[in-house]
């Protein structure tokens, strides 16, 4: 698709993921054993024939920049295109972060103009889904649209979390509400757009001069351009998940180990690519026991794993039991450890005899808005010393050391 540029918005923190995004942005969070969340959007681009891509980063971008690099795992290390990391930059008059999603694109008009595209696809880098963007663009063209928004129906009880649209029989959008208290429909924007470039460029320039604007596509740009009569909805019927909360992130990972998972990581016609460290094959010992789980490269399993996603380079020692959990890269689990209903972030060490995620649910004493499920979360680069007992809905921060024999009751925290 030589007349199309892809712009991936990847600067968000993802505050509802708590400690998982304190050190890295949401698009860089691990998913599915070997991937990072942004891998799915990047892979969708190349599978759709879009090879000119800008990734707009902002919050703690170092790991994301390193992960993407020159784009080799996605076949984006090429002349006349490829992937470019686009961070906010200083001018003679100001030095600011992107003020909103629309401002992020506005600040990179020069980058887009270098390729002189007819259309741009604006994408979120923090969702789990597969979509053929070429079909999306062709739909936009067939409608004679100036803007097209990918959408899907959501439960009406969840509609207040999304941009909600009302359409006519031809899918023309006649009304748009950004996160309404009383939604008029359950047709939700996925934050995925196709724009005719010459049109949206002028709209963004005009919006940049409006001091009352939040410079956001959902809040400002889409409502403003509805009057053109050329803004359409693109109904998407495939799999899409936001994974924006602890609960949804955990659930979406564990959906992958169902007998027939709703999201297929193994489709030979739509592969997902990533940058990952070369490791030896996984090893399961004579006494190791694995049931209904993903075990990634470099793992050594001497204990038991059930209904879990185990990322690369994880070591699980003898007598350990891991159930219903997401274990990220290079975690070490000691002898006779029990981990249940938990997320253990990268490079963390759980020493012998610990019990994590045990007991009964209790409300969080730290942050009820973020930590409101039975899931216990242990941040990256932490150490839980021997024989600790940690309940459900507990959060342990990044870079923490939990002293031996510590008891943290359900709903507790160490930040």
Swiss-Prot record:
Involved in the biosynthesis of ADP-glucose, a building block required for the elongation reactions to produce glycogen. Catalyzes the reaction between ATP and alpha-D-glucose 1-phosphate (G1P) to produce pyrophosphate and ADP-Glc. Belongs to the bacterial/plant glucose-1-phosphate adenylyltransferase family. Keywords: ATP-binding, Carbohydrate metabolism, Glycogen biosynthesis, Glycogen metabolism, Nucleotide-binding, Nucleotidyltransferase, Transferase. The gene is glgC. It catalyses: alpha-D-glucose 1-phosphate + ATP + H(+) = ADP-alpha-D-glucose + diphosphate. It comes from Fervidobacterium nodosum (strain ATCC 35602 / DSM 5306 / Rt17-B1). Pathway: Glycan biosynthesis; glycogen biosynthesis. It comes from the Bacteria. SUPFAM superfamilies: Nucleotide-diphospho-sugar transferases (SSF53448), Trimeric LpxA-like enzymes (SSF51161). This is Glucose-1-phosphate adenylyltransferase. Homotetramer. The lineage of its organism: Bacteria, Thermotogati, Thermotogota, Thermotogae, Thermotogales. Pfam families: Hexapep_GlmU, NTP_transferase. Its EC number is 2.7.7.27. CDD domains: ADP_Glucose_PP, LbH_G1P_AT_C. GO terms for molecular function: ATP binding; glucose-1-phosphate adenylyltransferase activity. InterPro entries: ADP-Glc_PPase, ADP_Glu_pyroP_CS, GlgC_bac, GlmU/GlgC-like_hexapep, NTP_transferase_dom, Nucleotide-diphossugar_trans, Trimer_LpxA-like_sf. It is an enzyme of class 2 (transferase). GO terms for biological process: glycogen biosynthetic process. Alpha-D-glucose 1-phosphate binds at residues 98, 163, 178-179, 189.
